[in-house]
From Swiss-Prot:
Keywords: Membrane, Metal-binding, Peroxisome, Protein transport, Transferase, Transmembrane, Transmembrane helix, Transport, Ubl conjugation pathway, Zinc, Zinc-finger. This is Peroxisome biogenesis factor 2. It comes from the Eukaryota. Its EC number is 2.3.2.27, 2.3.2.36. GO terms for cellular component: peroxisomal membrane. It is found in: Peroxisome membrane. Component of the PEX2-PEX10-PEX12 retrotranslocation channel. One of its GO terms (biological process) is pexophagy. Zn(2+) 2 binds at C260, H262, C281, C284. Zn(2+) 1 binds at C245, C248, C265, C268.
Length: 306
């Protein structure tokens, strides 16, 4: 079954975005491996790996190449996306894996090119006055510029034709194909619909909540939950009424009245009145006529009874 799938003719081309995603996944994997490897030497002397960093990175890339392209004809990113490399130099249209020469040259371009790019500065910095080294450095810089220009042209051609995402693939004659036939994908919009509903509901709440007077609503609920307590009118002192604020239920700080027989903290009544100009007493439903401080005398013995 696997042999028949590998030998079937290619029908569906690989998407450009899939090839670019595979390249990005490979770069992310290399960075992850290097970060994990360097974290193993955090307890050692600082700068221990800096001197040999290009060689260590090249060794790690060579290790990845050995167990991905050399054995499976596909990078890690291609394996995740159900892709692999095909020998495009073969005359037949059927799938042909990469030959050994293509794999070795791929390693030289991939690993050796990165190593030379990172190590070239150190190689020529120790011989700043040598004429031969200067010519070699100029020659390498010219080659590097030509390769970058060629990579740009190859990318533009890749966007048009959809083959050979990198210059290395075009030079070696290898391109990405699907490793297995693609099934018809069932596109579902459940997640998108749920996100749209939640975003719409959040925007509705952002528009609605500023229109609701929460302070007034809280006062109404407080008046319904705590009905008015009847106090004797014959009580000569206001000690019974003035022991607690009608809003917070605590001992009134800077007690004030609004014209009725009930007492409020200054902060409680002021904040409620500023948020609702039609504020009424939650116990007797009296409107605010005149906010004024309360002056009364209370015995110390009555305070200790609280």
């Amino acid at each position: 079954m696997a042999a028949s799938e590998n030998n079937m003719e290619e029908i569906n081309p690989v998407l450009r975005i899939s090839q670019l995603d595979a390249i990005e996944l490979n770069k992310a994997l290399e960075q992850l491996i290097w970060s994990q490897f360097s974290s193993c030497f955090q307890g050692f002397k600082p700068g221990l790996l800096t001197r040999f960093e290009p060689e260590i990175k090249a060794s790690l890339c060579l290790f990845l190449w050995r167990y991905t392209i050399y054995t499976k004809n596909a990078t890690v990113g291609q394996t995740i996306l159900n892709m692999q490399y095909k020998n495009d130099l073969a005359v037949t249209k059927k799938y042909r894996p990469l030959n050994k020469q293509q794999k070795v040259w791929f390693a030289l371009f991939l690993v050796g090119g990165k190593w030379l790019e990172e190590r070239s500065f150190d190689l020529f910095s120790n011989h700043p006055f040598g004429a031969s080294f200067q010519r070699t450095k100029y020659f390498l810089n010219a080659i590097s510029g030509l390769l970058k220009f060629g990579a740009l042209l190859n990318f533009l051609i890749f966007l048009q034709q959809g083959k050979f995402a990198t210059l290395t693939e075009r030079l070696l004659g290898i391109r990405s194909v699907f490793s297995r036939p693609q099934d018809v994908r069932q596109v579902g919009f459940e997640y998108m619909n749920r996100e749209i509903l939640w975003h719409g509901f959040a925007e509705f709440l952002i528009f609605l909540l500023p229109l609701i007077n929460t302070q007034k609503l809280k006062s109404k609920l407080f008046s319904w939950c705590k009905p008015a307590k009847s106090h004797g009118v014959s009580d000569p002192s206001l000690a019974v009424i003035c022991k607690e604020c009608c809003l917070c239920g605590e001992w009134p700080a800077m007690p004030h009245t609004i014209g009725c027989s009930h007492v409020f903290c200054y902060y409680c009544i002021k904040s409620n009145y500023m948020s609702d100009m039609y504020f009424t007493c939650p116990k007797c439903s009296s409107q605010v006529h005149n906010l004024q401080p309360l002056e009364f005398k209370i015995e110390i013995s009555e305070v200790h009874t609280l």
